[in-house]
Curated annotation (Swiss-Prot):
The keyword Ubl conjugation does not apply. F-type ATPases have 2 components, F(1) - the catalytic core - and F(0) - the membrane proton channel. F(1) has five subunits: alpha(3), beta(3), gamma(1), delta(1), epsilon(1). F(0) has three main subunits: a(1), b(2) and c(10-14). The alpha and beta chains form an alternating ring which encloses part of the gamma chain. F(1) is attached to F(0) by a central stalk formed by the gamma and epsilon chains, while a peripheral stalk is formed by the delta and b chains. The chain crosses the membrane at residues 8-28. Its main location: membrane. It is found in: Cell inner membrane. Keywords: ATP synthesis, Cell inner membrane, Cell membrane, CF(0), Hydrogen ion transport, Ion transport, Membrane, Transmembrane, Transmembrane helix, Transport. PANTHER family: ATP SYNTHASE SUBUNIT B, ATP SYNTHASE SUBUNIT B', CHLOROPLASTIC. GO terms for molecular function: proton-transporting ATP synthase activity, rotational mechanism; proton-transporting ATPase activity, rotational mechanism. InterPro entries: ATP_synth_b/b'su_bac/chlpt, ATP_synthase_B_chain. This is ATP synthase subunit b 1. Belongs to the ATPase B chain family. The keyword Transmembrane helix applies.
Amino acid sequence: MIELLSAAETWVAVGFAILMVVFVYFGVHRTVLNALDNRRDRIKAELDEASRLKEEAAKLLADYKARAASAEREAEAIIASAKDEAERIAAEAKAKLEDFVARRTKTAEGKIAMAEAQAIADVRAAAANAAVAAASSILSQSVKGSVADELIGKGIAEVRSKLN
């Protein structure tokens, strides 16, 4: 037994046992257990909060993705609408231009036809005047007197009515 009392391990065991008795007497084990329980509860609360935040972040991400997809669809619809509007405006402008060109062409053709008719009328009038002058000159040289004046008047009137 003396050997047992002189061994350092024995005194370490006795000191440890006394320390444990003191801890039990003062309720240190309850304090340690309460501290561990509090830590467990705090960690559980933090994990619950982290889980809630993760779910909230997932919902926000899903909402963001849905909004982004909706915005993309809306942008595509706006682009398609703008393209359709641009095509409609271009077609309308083309139709107006074609109508304008057709009216201008018709007006120009009408002016050309009027100028042509006027030129033909001027040529006919000049030809009639030349024919009247020639007939008058020929008749006045070949026929003399009152008969000549009467024939010349009838001939001139007839030529004018037929040539104009």
